[in-house]
């Protein structure tokens, strides 16, 4: 987990060296009408590492803003419009160079719109959603919360790479096979 501004900048520097990352956010749920909480957590994943930015602790999204506004790293996520809107409540951001998986997946004939369903369809495995409504502003995130949060961002990256036809980790190669559609992602990258 990334809990300080210095840690956030160090993580951002590393992430901006990646060609593509998965991204997601978590917000403390509100069970009362009219109450909205700010984004508490931003998850950004590479193939093997997921950074969990505790925005509710850092109180500054400048490092996240650098990543989102970068044109050198492709950001991949699902329902990014909602994630970006939540982050804009904290600071003005203009995201560049990203792919919305809901739109991208439709180019491959996938009609499912939830991350859990798209992932299960492609990989034959389920993503647990039991932590979705937990308190993301808690002083410490539980291991279950951290795993849930990291999995969502990581899954976005894996779905994108699988649809694009890029090599997957060994355990997925036998499960997923798709006709490759070279260059199709260019139509979906938001500048």
What do these predicted ranges mean?
Residues 120-181:
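Acidic, Mg2+-coordinating catalytic module of metal-dependent nucleases/exonucleases
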Residues 70-75:
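Short active-site oxyanion
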Residues 99-121, 145:
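Short alpha-helix plus adjacent loop in nuclease-associated cores
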Residues 23-25, 53-56, 77-80:
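Short His-Asn-centered micro-motif
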Residues 1-21, 90, 101, 154, ...:
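N-terminal accessory regions of nucleic-acid-interacting proteins
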Residues 20-33:
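Short acidic, Gly/Ser-rich segments with clustered Asp/Glu that frequently serve as metal-coordination loops
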Residues 30-31, 83-90:
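Short active-site loop/helix that positions an aromatic residue
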Residues 31-48:
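A short alpha/beta connector and helix-capping loop motif
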């Amino acid at each position: 987990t990334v809990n300080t501004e210095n840690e956030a900048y160090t993580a951002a520097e590393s992430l901006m060296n990646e060609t593509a990352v998965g991204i997601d956010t978590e917000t403390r749920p509100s069970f009362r009408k009219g109450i909205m909480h700010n984004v508490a957590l931003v998850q950004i994943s590479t193939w093997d590492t997921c950074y969990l930015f505790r925005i509710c602790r850092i109180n500054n999204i400048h490092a996240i803003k650098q990543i989102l506004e970068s044109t050198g790293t492709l950001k991949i996520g699902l329902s990014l419009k909602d994630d970006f809107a939540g982050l804009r409540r904290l600071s003005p951001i203009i995201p560049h160079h990203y792919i919305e998986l809901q739109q991208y997946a439709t180019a491959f004939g996938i009609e499912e719109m939830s991350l859990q369903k798209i992932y299960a369809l492609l990989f034959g495995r389920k993503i647990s959603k039991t932590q979705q409504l937990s308190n993301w502003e808690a002083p410490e995130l539980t291991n279950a919360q951290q795993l849930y949060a990291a999995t969502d961002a990581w899954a976005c990256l894996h779905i994108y790479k699988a649809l694009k036809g890029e090599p997957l980790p060994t355990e997925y190669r036998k499960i997923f096979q798709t006709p490759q559609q070279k260059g199709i992602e260019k139509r979906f990258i938001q500048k």
